[in-house]
Amino acid sequence: MIFDWGGTLTPWHTIDYAQMWRLVCEPHYPGNHEDRADAALAAENVLWEQARTEHRSASIFGVLERAGIEPTDALIASYLREWEPHTFTDPEGIAVLRQLRQREIKIGVLSNTMWPRSWHEDVFRRDGVLDLIDGAVYSSEIDWTKPHPRAFLAAMAAVGADNPERCVFVGDRPWDDIFGAKSVGMRAVLLPNSDVPTFADAQPDAVIGSLSELLPLIESW
């Protein structure tokens, strides 16, 4: 069982990225923090568009370099502090991960992310679930983003799986998650949210309204 992270293991939040960057930059660039924030947002948008259209990965440090912002420890601390409210693992997700572990089902994570592995592991450790995850792939560490098939194959390898037909992917994005997983032969479960665009060619094997519905679903398979 392989999960997306943002919007799946974490509840979906609508975020004002422009305001977030202003809050990050304000303590470190007095007098011109808005210009720095605008540059960071523009750089971030360019690299996310690259991920969407070319399936090429990027990192938060690439964003900062492109924006001309030095990644000091203090600035990174401000960035993580602003993001923290949006990173907490869904309590229903924690329960599902524990139930999967009890059933000896391998658990993986595959996330399109600009964050390094250590930041994600800090989040999972804080929420008490790091030891429940058998393997994880973060696009910041590889050349591709979802829905590129190699991203999904890398996630399978991370949990020691070699047969996609025995893997289930759970995600909130029809294009990145569902289409991508189905393209390599996985089953795919959609946990939709209203802010993510639909994609007609993405045909999930099931749609759930919450993670609490996942265990009864896979047991019916």
Give, region by region, the residue ranges found by the protein language model.
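N-terminal helical cap/lid subdomain that shapes the substrate entry/recognition surface
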Residues: M1-R103, P116-S118
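Asp-based, Mg2+/Mn2+-dependent phosphohydrolase catalytic module
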Residues: M1-F3, E34, I94, R98-R101, ...
